Amino acid sequence: MASEQSSPEINADNLNSSAADVHVQPPGEKEWSDGFYDKEVINGNTPDAPKRGFLGYLIIYLLCYPVSFGGFLPGWDSGITAGFINMDNFKMNFGSYKHSTGEYYLSNVRMGLLVAMFSVGCSIGGVAFARLADTLGRRLAIVIVVLVYMVGAIIQISSNHKWYQYFVGKIIYGLGAGGCSVLCPMLLSEIAPTDLRGGLVSLYQLNMTFGIFLGYCSVYGTRKYSNTAQWRIPVGLCFLWALIIIVGMLLVPESPRYLIECERHEEACVSIAKIDKVSPEDPWVLKQADEINAGVLAQRELGEASWKELFSVKTKVLQRLITGILVQTFLQLTGENYFFFYGTTIFKSVGLTDGFETSIVLGTVNFFSTIIAVMVVDKIGRRKCLLFGAASMMACMVIFASIGVKCLYPHGQDGPSSKGAGNAMIVFTCFYIFCFATTWAPVAYIVVAESFPSKVKSKAMSISTAFNWLWQFLIGFFTPFITGSIHFYYGYVFVGCLVAMFLYVFFFLPETIGLSLEETQLLYEEGIKPWKSASWVPPSRRGASSRETEAKKKSWKEVLKFPKSFN
Protein backbone atom coordinates (compact mmCIF):
# COMPACT_ATOMS: atom_id res chain seq x y z
CA MET A 1 0.00 0.00 0.00
CA ALA A 2 1.32 3.40 -0.87
CA SER A 3 2.21 5.83 1.86
CA GLU A 4 -0.40 7.98 3.58
CA GLN A 5 -0.43 11.77 3.32
CA SER A 6 2.32 13.15 5.47
CA SER A 7 0.43 15.99 7.10
CA PRO A 8 -1.07 15.00 10.46
CA GLU A 9 -3.12 18.20 10.69
CA ILE A 10 -6.88 17.68 10.88
CA ASN A 11 -8.70 20.11 8.63
CA ALA A 12 -11.38 20.15 6.00
CA ASP A 13 -8.88 19.62 3.17
CA ASN A 14 -7.30 16.39 4.37
CA LEU A 15 -10.46 14.98 5.90
CA ASN A 16 -12.48 15.58 2.76
CA SER A 17 -9.92 13.81 0.62
CA SER A 18 -9.52 10.08 0.46
CA ALA A 19 -6.86 10.18 -2.23
CA ALA A 20 -4.17 9.54 0.34
CA ASP A 21 -2.78 6.36 -1.16
CA VAL A 22 -2.37 6.60 -4.92
CA HIS A 23 -2.30 9.30 -7.55
CA VAL A 24 -4.87 8.46 -10.18
CA GLN A 25 -5.27 9.89 -13.64
CA PRO A 26 -9.06 10.28 -13.79
CA PRO A 27 -11.06 9.47 -16.90
CA GLY A 28 -12.30 12.36 -18.98
CA GLU A 29 -15.51 14.12 -18.09
CA LYS A 30 -17.42 12.39 -20.90
CA GLU A 31 -16.41 9.01 -19.52
CA TRP A 32 -17.61 9.99 -16.05
CA SER A 33 -20.99 11.11 -17.30
CA ASP A 34 -21.46 8.02 -19.48
CA GLY A 35 -20.12 5.54 -16.96
CA PHE A 36 -16.83 4.68 -15.30
CA TYR A 37 -16.11 1.63 -17.40
CA ASP A 38 -17.29 -0.09 -20.58
CA LYS A 39 -17.03 -3.50 -22.16
CA GLU A 40 -13.79 -2.61 -23.92
CA VAL A 41 -12.14 -1.91 -20.58
CA ILE A 42 -13.19 -5.21 -19.05
CA ASN A 43 -13.17 -7.30 -22.23
CA GLY A 44 -16.90 -7.77 -22.20
CA ASN A 45 -16.93 -9.52 -18.82
CA THR A 46 -18.52 -8.37 -15.59
CA PRO A 47 -15.58 -7.78 -13.23
CA ASP A 48 -15.31 -10.04 -10.22
CA ALA A 49 -14.93 -8.81 -6.67
CA PRO A 50 -11.35 -8.97 -5.37
CA LYS A 51 -10.50 -12.23 -3.64
CA ARG A 52 -9.58 -11.74 -0.02
CA GLY A 53 -7.46 -13.83 2.27
CA PHE A 54 -7.31 -13.45 6.02
CA LEU A 55 -5.06 -10.40 5.70
CA GLY A 56 -7.51 -8.78 3.28
CA TYR A 57 -10.39 -9.15 5.74
CA LEU A 58 -8.19 -7.90 8.58
CA ILE A 59 -7.24 -4.73 6.69
CA ILE A 60 -10.89 -3.94 5.95
CA TYR A 61 -11.92 -4.34 9.58
CA LEU A 62 -8.96 -2.31 10.85
CA LEU A 63 -9.72 0.55 8.44
CA CYS A 64 -13.35 0.64 9.54
CA TYR A 65 -12.71 0.22 13.25
CA PRO A 66 -12.05 3.91 14.11
CA VAL A 67 -15.47 4.79 12.64
CA SER A 68 -17.20 2.04 14.59
CA PHE A 69 -15.54 3.27 17.80
CA GLY A 70 -18.14 6.03 17.83
CA GLY A 71 -20.45 3.43 19.37
CA PHE A 72 -18.16 3.29 22.38
CA LEU A 73 -19.28 6.76 23.52
CA PRO A 74 -22.94 6.00 24.39
CA GLY A 75 -21.92 2.57 25.69
CA TRP A 76 -19.41 4.13 28.08
CA ASP A 77 -22.04 6.52 29.40
CA SER A 78 -24.49 3.66 30.04
CA GLY A 79 -21.84 1.71 31.94
CA ILE A 80 -20.61 4.51 34.18
CA THR A 81 -24.06 5.99 34.83
CA ALA A 82 -25.34 2.64 36.09
CA GLY A 83 -22.59 2.78 38.72
CA PHE A 84 -22.80 6.49 39.57
CA ILE A 85 -26.37 6.30 40.90
CA ASN A 86 -25.15 3.93 43.63
CA MET A 87 -21.92 5.78 44.57
CA ASP A 88 -21.84 7.56 47.93
CA ASN A 89 -19.75 10.55 46.83
CA PHE A 90 -21.85 11.08 43.74
CA LYS A 91 -25.04 11.09 45.81
CA MET A 92 -23.40 13.49 48.28
CA ASN A 93 -22.50 15.92 45.46
CA PHE A 94 -25.71 15.77 43.45
CA GLY A 95 -28.31 14.24 45.76
CA SER A 96 -30.34 15.40 48.75
CA TYR A 97 -29.74 14.88 52.47
CA LYS A 98 -32.25 12.80 54.42
CA HIS A 99 -32.22 13.83 58.10
CA SER A 100 -34.07 10.74 59.32
CA THR A 101 -31.33 8.41 58.08
CA GLY A 102 -28.36 10.77 57.98
CA GLU A 103 -27.62 9.73 54.38
CA TYR A 104 -27.61 11.31 50.95
CA TYR A 105 -29.94 9.94 48.30
CA LEU A 106 -31.09 10.58 44.73
CA SER A 107 -34.82 11.19 44.36
CA ASN A 108 -36.65 9.33 41.61
CA VAL A 109 -36.90 12.54 39.60
CA ARG A 110 -33.22 13.37 39.90
CA MET A 111 -32.16 9.78 39.26
CA GLY A 112 -34.37 9.64 36.18
CA LEU A 113 -32.93 12.92 34.90
CA LEU A 114 -29.38 11.76 35.58
CA VAL A 115 -29.93 8.68 33.44
CA ALA A 116 -32.10 10.30 30.77
CA MET A 117 -30.49 13.71 30.08
CA PHE A 118 -27.82 12.04 27.97
CA SER A 119 -30.56 10.62 25.74
CA VAL A 120 -32.13 14.07 25.34
CA GLY A 121 -28.81 15.41 24.08
CA CYS A 122 -28.37 12.43 21.76
CA SER A 123 -31.82 12.89 20.26
CA ILE A 124 -31.15 16.55 19.48
CA GLY A 125 -27.57 15.97 18.32
CA GLY A 126 -28.51 13.24 15.87
CA VAL A 127 -30.87 15.60 14.01
CA ALA A 128 -28.82 18.78 14.42
CA PHE A 129 -25.48 17.43 13.20
CA ALA A 130 -26.62 15.03 10.47
CA ARG A 131 -26.58 17.83 7.88
CA LEU A 132 -22.83 18.22 8.40
CA ALA A 133 -22.35 14.88 6.64
CA ASP A 134 -23.62 16.38 3.38
CA THR A 135 -21.83 19.73 3.66
CA LEU A 136 -18.44 18.86 5.18
CA GLY A 137 -18.13 15.14 4.53
CA ARG A 138 -18.66 12.22 6.86
CA ARG A 139 -15.21 12.22 8.46
CA LEU A 140 -14.92 15.92 9.29
CA ALA A 141 -18.48 15.86 10.63
CA ILE A 142 -17.53 13.03 13.00
CA VAL A 143 -14.53 15.01 14.28
CA ILE A 144 -16.75 18.03 15.01
CA VAL A 145 -19.34 16.06 16.98
CA VAL A 146 -16.59 14.35 18.99
CA LEU A 147 -15.23 17.79 19.96
CA VAL A 148 -18.72 18.73 21.17
CA TYR A 149 -18.72 15.52 23.21
CA MET A 150 -15.46 16.61 24.87
CA VAL A 151 -16.94 20.00 25.82
CA GLY A 152 -19.79 18.21 27.60
CA ALA A 153 -17.31 16.06 29.51
CA ILE A 154 -15.42 19.18 30.69
CA ILE A 155 -18.64 20.70 32.06
CA GLN A 156 -19.45 17.49 33.95
CA ILE A 157 -16.01 17.16 35.50
CA SER A 158 -16.04 20.78 36.67
CA SER A 159 -19.42 20.36 38.41
CA ASN A 160 -19.24 20.56 42.19
CA HIS A 161 -22.44 20.25 44.24
CA LYS A 162 -24.38 21.73 41.30
CA TRP A 163 -26.56 19.01 39.88
CA TYR A 164 -28.01 21.33 37.22
CA GLN A 165 -24.51 22.08 35.86
CA TYR A 166 -23.81 18.36 35.68
CA PHE A 167 -27.05 17.80 33.76
CA VAL A 168 -26.27 20.61 31.29
CA GLY A 169 -22.90 18.96 30.67
CA LYS A 170 -24.70 15.66 30.24
CA ILE A 171 -26.93 17.11 27.52
CA ILE A 172 -23.99 18.64 25.60
CA TYR A 173 -22.07 15.39 26.06
CA GLY A 174 -25.09 13.65 24.52
CA LEU A 175 -25.19 16.05 21.56
CA GLY A 176 -21.82 14.73 20.43
CA ALA A 177 -22.61 11.07 21.05
CA GLY A 178 -25.94 11.48 19.26
CA GLY A 179 -24.19 12.92 16.24
CA CYS A 180 -21.89 9.89 16.21
CA SER A 181 -24.89 7.55 16.39
CA VAL A 182 -26.02 8.86 12.97
CA LEU A 183 -22.73 9.67 11.26
CA CYS A 184 -20.72 6.56 12.18
CA PRO A 185 -23.20 3.91 10.92
CA MET A 186 -23.75 6.10 7.84
CA LEU A 187 -20.05 6.17 6.96
CA LEU A 188 -19.61 2.48 7.75
CA SER A 189 -22.47 1.49 5.45
CA GLU A 190 -21.04 3.62 2.62
CA ILE A 191 -17.43 2.41 2.71
CA ALA A 192 -18.17 -1.25 3.49
CA PRO A 193 -18.09 -3.89 0.72
CA THR A 194 -21.59 -5.27 0.11
CA ASP A 195 -20.77 -8.76 1.40
CA LEU A 196 -19.34 -7.35 4.66
CA ARG A 197 -21.65 -4.40 5.26
CA GLY A 198 -23.73 -6.05 7.97
CA GLY A 199 -20.68 -7.16 9.94
CA LEU A 200 -18.92 -3.81 9.63
CA VAL A 201 -21.96 -1.79 10.69
CA SER A 202 -22.32 -4.28 13.57
CA LEU A 203 -18.90 -3.15 14.79
CA TYR A 204 -20.63 0.04 15.94
CA GLN A 205 -22.81 -2.01 18.28
CA LEU A 206 -19.84 -4.17 19.31
CA ASN A 207 -18.02 -1.06 20.47
CA MET A 208 -21.13 0.09 22.29
CA THR A 209 -21.12 -3.17 24.27
CA PHE A 210 -17.36 -2.78 24.80
CA GLY A 211 -18.03 0.69 26.21
CA ILE A 212 -20.72 -0.65 28.55
CA PHE A 213 -18.35 -3.37 29.78
CA LEU A 214 -15.38 -1.04 30.37
CA GLY A 215 -17.73 1.50 31.97
CA TYR A 216 -18.82 -1.14 34.48
CA CYS A 217 -15.17 -2.03 35.12
CA SER A 218 -14.17 1.61 35.65
CA VAL A 219 -16.82 2.32 38.30
CA TYR A 220 -16.00 -1.01 39.94
CA GLY A 221 -12.39 0.14 40.18
CA THR A 222 -13.21 3.61 41.59
CA ARG A 223 -16.17 2.71 43.83
CA LYS A 224 -14.03 2.57 46.99
CA TYR A 225 -12.61 6.09 46.61
CA SER A 226 -14.13 8.44 49.17
CA ASN A 227 -13.67 11.68 47.20
CA THR A 228 -14.84 12.99 43.81
CA ALA A 229 -12.29 10.77 42.04
CA GLN A 230 -15.00 8.13 42.47
CA TRP A 231 -16.92 9.59 39.52
CA ARG A 232 -14.56 12.16 37.96
CA ILE A 233 -12.03 9.57 36.78
CA PRO A 234 -14.58 7.65 34.65
CA VAL A 235 -15.85 10.92 33.13
CA GLY A 236 -12.27 12.10 32.50
CA LEU A 237 -11.48 8.96 30.51
CA CYS A 238 -13.92 10.26 27.88
CA PHE A 239 -11.08 12.38 26.47
CA LEU A 240 -9.07 9.26 25.65
CA TRP A 241 -11.96 7.71 23.72
CA ALA A 242 -12.54 10.96 21.84
CA LEU A 243 -8.87 11.18 20.87
CA ILE A 244 -8.94 7.65 19.44
CA ILE A 245 -11.78 8.62 17.10
CA ILE A 246 -10.21 11.93 16.01
CA VAL A 247 -6.85 10.35 15.16
CA GLY A 248 -8.61 7.42 13.48
CA MET A 249 -10.40 9.75 11.07
CA LEU A 250 -7.02 10.52 9.45
CA LEU A 251 -6.75 6.89 8.37
CA VAL A 252 -10.31 6.10 7.29
CA PRO A 253 -11.33 6.60 3.63
CA GLU A 254 -14.09 9.11 2.93
CA SER A 255 -17.47 7.90 1.71
CA PRO A 256 -17.28 7.32 -2.06
CA ARG A 257 -20.96 8.31 -2.32
CA TYR A 258 -20.24 11.69 -0.75
CA LEU A 259 -17.22 12.19 -3.03
CA ILE A 260 -19.18 11.37 -6.18
CA GLU A 261 -21.96 13.72 -5.11
CA CYS A 262 -19.24 16.40 -4.90
CA GLU A 263 -17.95 15.49 -8.41
CA ARG A 264 -14.68 14.16 -6.95
CA HIS A 265 -14.74 10.98 -8.98
CA GLU A 266 -11.08 10.01 -8.90
CA GLU A 267 -11.00 10.34 -5.11
CA ALA A 268 -14.06 8.11 -4.91
CA CYS A 269 -12.21 5.41 -6.87
CA VAL A 270 -9.25 5.69 -4.52
CA SER A 271 -11.60 5.39 -1.53
CA ILE A 272 -13.19 2.21 -2.91
CA ALA A 273 -9.78 0.79 -3.84
CA LYS A 274 -8.32 1.49 -0.40
CA ILE A 275 -10.86 -0.77 1.31
CA ASP A 276 -10.14 -3.78 -0.92
CA LYS A 277 -6.42 -2.98 -1.38
CA VAL A 278 -6.55 -2.91 -5.18
CA SER A 279 -5.68 -0.37 -7.87
CA PRO A 280 -8.11 2.54 -8.31
CA GLU A 281 -8.20 1.57 -12.00
CA ASP A 282 -9.24 -2.01 -11.25
CA PRO A 283 -12.40 -2.93 -13.27
CA TRP A 284 -14.18 -3.92 -10.06
CA VAL A 285 -13.51 -0.50 -8.54
CA LEU A 286 -14.73 1.24 -11.69
CA LYS A 287 -17.88 -0.89 -11.71
CA GLN A 288 -18.66 0.02 -8.09
CA ALA A 289 -18.06 3.69 -8.83
CA ASP A 290 -20.29 3.46 -11.90
CA GLU A 291 -23.17 2.02 -9.88
CA ILE A 292 -22.82 4.72 -7.23
CA ASN A 293 -22.62 7.41 -9.90
CA ALA A 294 -25.78 6.10 -11.60
CA GLY A 295 -27.62 6.22 -8.29
CA VAL A 296 -26.40 9.74 -7.56
CA LEU A 297 -27.44 10.96 -11.03
CA ALA A 298 -30.86 9.36 -10.67
CA GLN A 299 -31.37 11.08 -7.31
CA ARG A 300 -30.08 14.38 -8.71
CA GLU A 301 -32.68 14.35 -11.47
CA LEU A 302 -35.36 14.36 -8.80
CA GLY A 303 -34.07 17.67 -7.47
CA GLU A 304 -32.56 18.75 -4.18
CA ALA A 305 -33.82 16.84 -1.17
CA SER A 306 -36.02 18.69 1.28
CA TRP A 307 -37.60 17.58 4.53
CA LYS A 308 -40.83 17.26 2.56
CA GLU A 309 -39.15 14.53 0.49
CA LEU A 310 -39.20 12.26 3.53
CA PHE A 311 -42.97 11.99 3.19
CA SER A 312 -42.89 10.87 -0.44
CA VAL A 313 -45.17 7.90 -1.10
CA LYS A 314 -44.14 7.63 -4.75
CA THR A 315 -40.51 6.75 -3.97
CA LYS A 316 -41.57 4.87 -0.81
CA VAL A 317 -39.28 6.99 1.33
CA LEU A 318 -42.12 7.45 3.82
CA GLN A 319 -42.50 3.68 4.15
CA ARG A 320 -38.80 3.36 4.85
CA LEU A 321 -38.84 6.26 7.29
CA ILE A 322 -41.64 4.58 9.25
CA THR A 323 -39.63 1.35 9.23
CA GLY A 324 -36.53 3.18 10.48
CA ILE A 325 -38.48 4.93 13.24
CA LEU A 326 -40.21 1.75 14.40
CA VAL A 327 -37.06 -0.39 14.30
CA GLN A 328 -35.19 2.17 16.43
CA THR A 329 -38.20 2.51 18.74
CA PHE A 330 -38.48 -1.26 19.14
CA LEU A 331 -34.76 -1.41 19.90
CA GLN A 332 -35.49 0.44 23.14
CA LEU A 333 -38.78 -1.33 23.83
CA THR A 334 -36.95 -4.65 24.05
CA GLY A 335 -36.21 -3.56 27.62
CA GLU A 336 -32.43 -3.79 27.30
CA ASN A 337 -31.78 -0.46 29.00
CA TYR A 338 -33.90 -1.57 31.93
CA PHE A 339 -30.96 -3.88 32.71
CA PHE A 340 -28.08 -1.69 31.54
CA PHE A 341 -29.12 1.55 33.26
CA TYR A 342 -30.44 0.03 36.47
CA GLY A 343 -28.44 -3.21 36.58
CA THR A 344 -26.73 -2.55 39.90
CA THR A 345 -30.02 -1.44 41.45
CA ILE A 346 -31.94 -4.47 40.12
CA PHE A 347 -29.44 -6.98 41.42
CA LYS A 348 -29.24 -5.39 44.82
CA SER A 349 -33.02 -5.85 44.97
CA VAL A 350 -32.66 -9.59 44.38
CA GLY A 351 -30.34 -9.97 47.35
CA LEU A 352 -26.85 -9.34 45.95
CA THR A 353 -24.65 -7.19 48.14
CA ASP A 354 -22.39 -6.07 45.26
CA GLY A 355 -24.43 -5.29 42.17
CA PHE A 356 -21.29 -3.85 40.53
CA GLU A 357 -19.80 -7.33 40.10
CA THR A 358 -22.96 -8.71 38.51
CA SER A 359 -23.05 -5.76 36.11
CA ILE A 360 -19.55 -6.69 34.94
CA VAL A 361 -20.77 -10.24 34.27
CA LEU A 362 -23.67 -8.87 32.21
CA GLY A 363 -21.33 -6.53 30.35
CA THR A 364 -19.06 -9.47 29.51
CA VAL A 365 -21.98 -11.53 28.16
CA ASN A 366 -23.14 -8.53 26.13
CA PHE A 367 -19.72 -7.91 24.58
CA PHE A 368 -18.85 -11.47 23.59
CA SER A 369 -22.36 -12.12 22.28
CA THR A 370 -22.03 -9.15 19.95
CA ILE A 371 -18.79 -10.60 18.55
CA ILE A 372 -20.86 -13.58 17.39
CA ALA A 373 -23.31 -11.20 15.72
CA VAL A 374 -20.51 -9.47 13.78
CA MET A 375 -19.41 -12.82 12.33
CA VAL A 376 -22.79 -14.22 11.33
CA VAL A 377 -25.11 -11.30 10.53
CA ASP A 378 -24.12 -11.32 6.84
CA LYS A 379 -24.77 -15.06 6.61
CA ILE A 380 -28.15 -15.38 8.34
CA GLY A 381 -30.01 -12.30 7.13
CA ARG A 382 -31.69 -9.33 8.79
CA ARG A 383 -35.22 -10.72 9.06
CA LYS A 384 -34.21 -14.05 10.59
CA CYS A 385 -32.04 -12.32 13.18
CA LEU A 386 -34.80 -9.92 14.22
CA LEU A 387 -37.55 -12.56 14.30
CA PHE A 388 -35.45 -14.98 16.35
CA GLY A 389 -34.36 -12.18 18.65
CA ALA A 390 -37.90 -10.99 19.37
CA ALA A 391 -39.16 -14.53 20.08
CA SER A 392 -36.22 -15.55 22.29
CA MET A 393 -36.16 -12.29 24.28
CA MET A 394 -39.90 -12.60 24.84
CA ALA A 395 -39.43 -16.06 26.37
CA CYS A 396 -36.61 -14.85 28.63
CA MET A 397 -38.52 -11.76 29.76
CA VAL A 398 -41.65 -13.79 30.60
CA ILE A 399 -39.58 -16.08 32.83
CA PHE A 400 -37.63 -13.19 34.41
CA ALA A 401 -40.77 -11.21 35.23
CA SER A 402 -42.70 -14.25 36.46
CA ILE A 403 -39.95 -15.26 38.88
CA GLY A 404 -39.72 -11.68 40.14
CA VAL A 405 -43.47 -11.47 40.67
CA LYS A 406 -44.18 -14.95 42.06
CA CYS A 407 -41.00 -16.29 43.67
CA LEU A 408 -38.53 -13.54 44.60
CA TYR A 409 -40.34 -12.42 47.77
CA PRO A 410 -42.10 -15.52 49.17
CA HIS A 411 -43.05 -13.64 52.37
CA GLY A 412 -44.08 -10.37 50.75
CA GLN A 413 -42.21 -7.26 49.56
CA ASP A 414 -41.08 -6.42 53.09
CA GLY A 415 -39.64 -9.89 53.72
CA PRO A 416 -36.26 -11.32 52.67
CA SER A 417 -35.73 -12.26 49.04
CA SER A 418 -35.21 -15.83 47.84
CA LYS A 419 -31.59 -16.41 46.86
CA GLY A 420 -32.54 -19.22 44.46
CA ALA A 421 -35.09 -17.02 42.70
CA GLY A 422 -32.57 -14.18 42.50
CA ASN A 423 -29.95 -16.46 40.95
CA ALA A 424 -32.49 -17.74 38.42
CA MET A 425 -33.34 -14.15 37.46
CA ILE A 426 -29.66 -13.40 36.85
CA VAL A 427 -29.32 -16.51 34.65
CA PHE A 428 -32.29 -15.53 32.50
CA THR A 429 -31.02 -11.97 32.34
CA CYS A 430 -27.81 -13.35 30.83
CA PHE A 431 -29.83 -15.42 28.32
CA TYR A 432 -31.86 -12.34 27.47
CA ILE A 433 -28.76 -10.21 26.90
CA PHE A 434 -27.23 -12.93 24.71
CA CYS A 435 -30.36 -12.98 22.54
CA PHE A 436 -30.47 -9.18 22.36
CA ALA A 437 -26.77 -8.72 21.61
CA THR A 438 -26.75 -11.26 18.77
CA THR A 439 -29.87 -9.95 17.04
CA TRP A 440 -31.60 -6.63 17.62
CA ALA A 441 -28.63 -4.73 19.04
CA PRO A 442 -26.55 -4.77 15.82
CA VAL A 443 -29.22 -5.42 13.18
CA ALA A 444 -31.38 -2.39 14.06
CA TYR A 445 -28.49 -0.08 13.09
CA ILE A 446 -27.84 -2.08 9.91
CA VAL A 447 -31.47 -1.80 8.79
CA VAL A 448 -31.50 1.97 9.26
CA ALA A 449 -28.08 2.48 7.64
CA GLU A 450 -28.96 0.64 4.43
CA SER A 451 -32.64 1.54 3.94
CA PHE A 452 -32.55 5.10 2.60
CA PRO A 453 -31.47 6.61 -0.75
CA SER A 454 -28.38 8.80 -0.46
CA LYS A 455 -30.40 11.91 -1.31
CA VAL A 456 -32.32 11.83 1.99
CA LYS A 457 -30.08 9.52 3.98
CA SER A 458 -28.72 12.00 6.52
CA LYS A 459 -32.18 13.43 7.25
CA ALA A 460 -33.94 10.06 7.45
CA MET A 461 -31.24 8.44 9.60
CA SER A 462 -31.21 11.39 11.98
CA ILE A 463 -34.98 11.21 12.53
CA SER A 464 -34.95 7.42 12.95
CA THR A 465 -32.10 7.56 15.44
CA ALA A 466 -33.74 10.46 17.29
CA PHE A 467 -36.64 8.15 18.13
CA ASN A 468 -34.15 5.67 19.59
CA TRP A 469 -32.84 8.32 21.95
CA LEU A 470 -36.32 9.67 22.68
CA TRP A 471 -37.52 6.26 23.85
CA GLN A 472 -34.29 5.74 25.75
CA PHE A 473 -35.01 9.00 27.58
CA LEU A 474 -38.59 7.94 28.39
CA ILE A 475 -37.52 4.52 29.67
CA GLY A 476 -34.57 5.94 31.59
CA PHE A 477 -36.62 8.67 33.24
CA PHE A 478 -39.82 6.80 34.08
CA THR A 479 -38.37 3.40 35.06
CA PRO A 480 -37.73 4.39 38.73
CA PHE A 481 -41.36 5.48 39.07
CA ILE A 482 -42.79 2.44 37.27
CA THR A 483 -40.71 -0.13 39.14
CA GLY A 484 -41.58 1.62 42.39
CA SER A 485 -45.27 1.06 41.63
CA ILE A 486 -45.50 -2.31 39.83
CA HIS A 487 -42.06 -3.81 40.57
CA PHE A 488 -41.27 -6.79 38.32
CA TYR A 489 -44.64 -6.64 36.57
CA TYR A 490 -42.80 -4.08 34.45
CA GLY A 491 -41.29 -6.99 32.53
CA TYR A 492 -44.70 -7.90 31.10
CA VAL A 493 -44.88 -4.47 29.45
CA PHE A 494 -41.76 -5.35 27.46
CA VAL A 495 -43.21 -8.77 26.62
CA GLY A 496 -46.13 -7.07 24.89
CA CYS A 497 -43.72 -4.86 22.96
CA LEU A 498 -41.70 -7.89 21.86
CA VAL A 499 -44.84 -9.54 20.45
CA ALA A 500 -45.55 -6.38 18.43
CA MET A 501 -41.94 -6.34 17.20
CA PHE A 502 -42.15 -9.92 15.92
CA LEU A 503 -45.34 -9.21 13.98
CA TYR A 504 -44.03 -5.97 12.48
CA VAL A 505 -40.79 -7.52 11.24
CA PHE A 506 -42.61 -10.49 9.69
CA PHE A 507 -45.16 -8.43 7.78
CA PHE A 508 -43.31 -5.20 6.96
CA LEU A 509 -39.51 -5.54 6.98
CA PRO A 510 -37.83 -6.81 3.76
CA GLU A 511 -34.61 -8.82 3.63
CA THR A 512 -31.59 -6.89 2.30
CA ILE A 513 -28.75 -9.38 2.78
CA GLY A 514 -26.29 -9.41 -0.12
CA LEU A 515 -27.65 -6.25 -1.78
CA SER A 516 -25.67 -3.13 -2.53
CA LEU A 517 -27.15 0.12 -1.23
CA GLU A 518 -28.35 0.93 -4.75
CA GLU A 519 -29.99 -2.50 -5.13
CA THR A 520 -31.75 -2.04 -1.79
CA GLN A 521 -33.47 1.03 -3.25
CA LEU A 522 -34.75 -1.07 -6.18
CA LEU A 523 -36.09 -3.69 -3.77
CA TYR A 524 -38.25 -1.10 -2.03
CA GLU A 525 -39.36 0.52 -5.28
CA GLU A 526 -40.54 -2.79 -6.77
CA GLY A 527 -42.83 -3.33 -3.77
CA ILE A 528 -41.78 -6.93 -3.02
CA LYS A 529 -43.69 -8.50 -0.13
CA PRO A 530 -41.32 -8.69 2.88
CA TRP A 531 -41.82 -12.42 3.48
CA LYS A 532 -40.83 -13.07 -0.16
CA SER A 533 -37.97 -10.57 -0.30
CA ALA A 534 -35.20 -13.06 0.56
CA SER A 535 -35.55 -14.65 -2.89
CA TRP A 536 -35.67 -11.33 -4.79
CA VAL A 537 -32.82 -10.87 -7.26
CA PRO A 538 -31.86 -7.42 -8.58
CA PRO A 539 -32.29 -6.78 -12.34
CA SER A 540 -28.53 -6.87 -12.96
CA ARG A 541 -28.31 -10.40 -11.56
CA ARG A 542 -31.54 -12.00 -12.72
CA GLY A 543 -31.09 -15.48 -14.07
CA ALA A 544 -28.59 -16.28 -11.32
CA SER A 545 -29.31 -18.06 -8.06
CA SER A 546 -30.81 -16.08 -5.23
CA ARG A 547 -28.48 -13.74 -3.39
CA GLU A 548 -29.33 -15.43 -0.10
CA THR A 549 -27.98 -18.73 -1.43
CA GLU A 550 -24.86 -17.03 -2.75
CA ALA A 551 -24.27 -15.33 0.58
CA LYS A 552 -24.54 -18.61 2.43
CA LYS A 553 -21.88 -20.15 0.18
CA LYS A 554 -19.43 -17.72 1.73
CA SER A 555 -19.42 -19.22 5.20
CA TRP A 556 -18.12 -16.93 7.90
CA LYS A 557 -15.54 -19.60 8.58
CA GLU A 558 -13.74 -18.41 5.43
CA VAL A 559 -12.95 -15.22 7.29
CA LEU A 560 -11.03 -17.19 9.89
CA LYS A 561 -9.27 -19.50 7.41
CA PHE A 562 -5.56 -18.80 6.90
CA PRO A 563 -4.66 -19.19 3.21
CA LYS A 564 -1.29 -20.49 2.05
CA SER A 565 -0.32 -16.98 1.05
CA PHE A 566 -1.88 -13.73 2.20
CA ASN A 567 -3.24 -11.22 -0.27
Curated annotation (Swiss-Prot):
Extracellular side: 77-112, 161-170, 219-232, 354-359, 406-427, 487
Superkingdom per UniProt: Eukaryota
PANTHER family: GALACTOSE TRANSPORTER-RELATED, PLASTIDIC GLUCOSE TRANSPORTER 4
Gene designation per UniProt: HXT16
Family: Belongs to the major facilitator superfamily. Sugar transporter (TC 2.A.1.1) family.
The protein's name: Hexose transporter HXT16
The species this protein was found in: Saccharomyces cerevisiae (strain ATCC 204508 / S288c) (Baker's yeast)
Phylogenetic classification of the source organism: Eukaryota, Fungi, Dikarya, Ascomycota, Saccharomycotina
TM stretches of this protein: 56-76, 113-133, 140-160, 171-191, 198-218, 233-253, 337-353, 360-377, 385-405, 428-448, 466-486, 488-508
Protein's job: Probable glucose transporter.
GO biological process, one term: sorbitol transmembrane transport
Gene Ontology CC terms, in alphabetical order: cell periphery; plasma membrane
Disulfides per UniProt: none
Polar residues composition-biased segments: 1-19
Keywords associated with the record: Membrane, Repeat, Sugar transport, Transmembrane, Transmembrane helix, Transport
Bilayer topology term: Multi-pass membrane protein
Ranges in the topological domain labelled Cytoplasmic: 1-55, 134-139, 192-197, 254-336, 378-384, 449-465, 509-567
The keyword Oxidoreductase appears for this protein: no
Region entry Disordered, spans: 1-32, 533-555
Subcellular location(s) of the protein: Membrane
Pfam family, one: Sugar_tr
Example of a GO MF term: carbohydrate:proton symporter activity
Biased composition (Basic and acidic residues): 545-555
